[in-house]
């Protein structure tokens, strides 16, 4: 049996693969797309009722679930309710989670769902604290992800 952290890491890896499918110029095959969507969805469903043993593990779990549900196209009808439940858990965590990369990642994961400018502003405040040094790979990735979300708010855009 895998540890909760191993399952979280696995969900993150598969979600990342699904979200970046085809961005490398390789063709997207429908069977691989379906397989990744199914895998991400089932992993999210498996982990949905879980809770981290520590504040950090719970934050990592919420990030993984929000990312996974965001990545998959599957919705048997209760996906929005589950996303809202994870958002509620995340907002409770943000009340106690210290300023850190993990907090920034959770803020951005929540922002990706609701596009609340206060979440983005708080993430930017954390990022601004990194300006006087070279960014780690993870910091660079979260900066780029937030930038991409702010530039492409498709789910919150109205089509004329």
Q: Each PLM stretch: what is its role?
A:
Residues 2-27, 51-73, 98-114, 140-152:
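Amphipathic alpha-helical repeat scaffolds of TPR domains
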Residues 36-49, 75-94, 118-132, 158-160:
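Alpha-helical repeat scaffolds
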Residues 101, 122, 136:
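Extended ligand-binding groove/face enriched in aromatic
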Residues 128-160:
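Acidic, proline/glycine-rich low-complexity IDRs
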